[in-house]
């Protein structure tokens, strides 16, 4: 039977349509996915992300361990609360998961990992942590609410006490701070400003209700997906998985190649892939009628006249832009246009960078 987050009852009270999402009963929408999407782009919306897994790591060798475990380098994290995004790779350079890591002290870091990959992530982390003497604590006692949108931080701050407001004042993106019962982070999955707030399970329902009263709109998985796709953010199992290199998933920027003597899991395989070349992730835009969908073929002819085929990894109608957008994994050599096969029609698409909307505005 699917698990329920501590906010399940709040979702039903708000009229949510609930679905099984990787073993969790989660809200798909609360009546209108489109309205929820626009609320985040223009005002403030919130998502229950309590199904994600928070993992606290303690030990004197935690930084050393994470420099080995992750493709990005936690040596960059020198200020308490600073976070970075990274892939956690296998030996062949495939992506086991993408995650966020927070640095607090030399012997205390925090990971936030995906729900669908929870068990394999915990197994992998535990296996590799043992030689480093790391103490692993899975924080199932915490719920998490993402409050996103141009007015999200201001509306959320009406629930904070003076000390919490002071703690987050002027906080830059990709930071987190523990302020009383709340862990407040300037992270998100929408391309908008906002907070992701972790708090004790028993306090989550009251906090959710207070956010509703503050004018923050409950949003479901449907809006979360269209928002992240507009923002060009990857979804695990679609843009990447254990067989796909981060170099083929627009995650090259998350690989810290320097210093050259840092050994991390998957490095040798990645260096070979970088030398020989991989597929790449691009954006597609179709302004004609129709919707670009996952797994549709993408065809193009390169400058030498050779024909190639790739695949759409995520596609949708963009509520913000008013036309269809997609992310696609394609061979090298793609130009400014391509063809997508939709049923029996060949539809022309424009090839773009894999990001479409940031802070409510179209990315040119």
Curated annotation (Swiss-Prot):
Its EC number is 2.1.2.10. GO terms for biological process: glycine decarboxylation via glycine cleavage system. It comes from the Bacteria. Belongs to the GcvT family. It comes from Escherichia coli O6:H1 (strain CFT073 / ATCC 700928 / UPEC). This is Aminomethyltransferase. Keywords: Aminotransferase, Transferase. The keyword RNA-binding does not apply. One of its GO terms (molecular function) is aminomethyltransferase activity. InterPro entries: GCS_T, GCS_T_bac, GCST_C, GCV_T_N, GcvT/YgfZ/DmdA, GcvT/YgfZ_C, TrmE/GcvT_dom1.
């Amino acid at each position: 039977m699917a698990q329920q987050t501590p906010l399940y009852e709040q979702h039903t009270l708000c009229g949510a349509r609930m679905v099984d999402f990787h073993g969790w009963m989660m809200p798909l929408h609360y009546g209108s996915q489109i309205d929820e999407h626009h609320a985040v782009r223009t005002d403030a919306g919130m998502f229950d992300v309590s199904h994600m897994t928070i993992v606290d790591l303690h030990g004197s060798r935690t930084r050393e361990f994470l420099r080995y475990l992750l493709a990005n380098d936690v040596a960059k994290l020198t200020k308490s609360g600073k976070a970075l995004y990274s892939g956690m790779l296998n030996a062949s350079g495939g992506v086991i998961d993408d995650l966020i890591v927070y640095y607090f002290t030399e012997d205390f870091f925090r990971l936030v990992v995906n729900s669908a990959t929870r068990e394999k992530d915990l197994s992998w982390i535990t296996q590799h942590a043992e030689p480093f003497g790391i103490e692993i604590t899975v924080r199932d006692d915490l719920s998490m609410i993402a409050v996103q949108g141009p007015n999200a931080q201001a509306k959320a701050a009406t629930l904070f006490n003076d000390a919490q407001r002071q703690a987050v004042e002027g906080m830059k993106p990709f930071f987190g701070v523990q302020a009383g019962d709340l862990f407040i982070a300037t992270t998100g999955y929408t391309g908008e400003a906002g907070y992701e707030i972790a708090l004790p399970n028993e306090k989550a329902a009251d906090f959710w209700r207070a956010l509703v009263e503050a004018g923050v709109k409950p949003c479901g998985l449907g809006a979360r997906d269209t928002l992240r796709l507009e923002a060009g953010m990857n979804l695990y199992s679609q843009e990447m998985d254990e067989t796909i290199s981060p170099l083929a998933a627009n995650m090259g920027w998350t690989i810290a190649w320097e210093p050259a003597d840092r050994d991390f899991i998957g490095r040798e395989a990645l260096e070979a892939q970088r030398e020989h070349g991989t597929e790449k992730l691009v954006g597609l835009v179709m302004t004609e009628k129709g919707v670009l969908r996952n797994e549709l073929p993408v065809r193009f002819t390169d400058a030498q006249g050779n024909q190639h085929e790739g695949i759409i990894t995520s596609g949708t109608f963009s509520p913000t832009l008013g036309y269809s957008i997609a992310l696609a994994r394609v061979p090298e050599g793609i130009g400014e246009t391509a063809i997508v096969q939709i049923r029996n029609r060949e539809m022309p698409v424009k090839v773009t960078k894999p990001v479409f909307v940031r802070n409510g505005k179209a990315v040119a």
